[in-house]
Amino acid sequence: IFKKLISKKRNYLKRNISPQEYQKIIELGEINIQTEIEKKRIFPYQNVGSHIVGYVDVDNQGIAGSERAFNTELNNGNDIYLTIDIMLQNAVSNELTDIVNKFSAESGAVIIMDIKNSEILSLNNYPDFNPNNLNNSNAEDRLNRALQSNYEMGSTFKPLTAANGFDYDIIKCAE
């Protein structure tokens, strides 16, 4: 620590200290330590919607999700508004967790869209993570499976083929 203190280089002894820790430093008297107030983004919904919201690094730079997509706006103090319905997001998150556990699956993903305007109303992944505490998660938890994983289309493409058949009168309702 002494080498860091006498160095001309700026060094952090500790970042994001609590008010109690700050008070203890003040009580030490006159010492050559500078304190600096830093902004910190707080994620009030914790794990709910974590893959949509994303996360930031120690310097509040967006690394993933909306935090990355809107990093400049957020760092400039602007608000952003998403189409996500937090009540729906929470309900789907709980259902997804139950289904994954019921079938002993390793992971799962759900996307719910408004068919009238294509807005994303809910996007969930399991496992998820708490962006307030990235130390308790790993890369697998932070992977947005709904958008970043590869899946074989299989039978999910059949409704599109059928719809196309109806559009071109190849398939009739009676068939």
Regions found by a protein language model. Give the residues of each.
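Short beta->alpha transition motifs characteristic of CBS
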Residues: V56-D59, S122-D128
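Active-site loop and adjoining helix of the penicillin-binding protein/serine DD-peptidase-beta-lactamase fold
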Residues: N76-I115, P131-E175
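Long, contiguous hydrophobic alpha-helical segments, chiefly transmembrane helices and signal peptides
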Residues: T35, V53, S66, N124, ...
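Basic, glycine-enriched DNA-binding surface that flanks or lies within the catalytic cores of DNA
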Residues: E38, M113, L121-N124
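Small/polar-residue-rich segments within soluble enzyme cores
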Residues: K4-N78, L82
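Short, solvent-exposed loop/turn and secondary-structure capping segments
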Residues: Q46, A64, L121-Y126, N133, ...
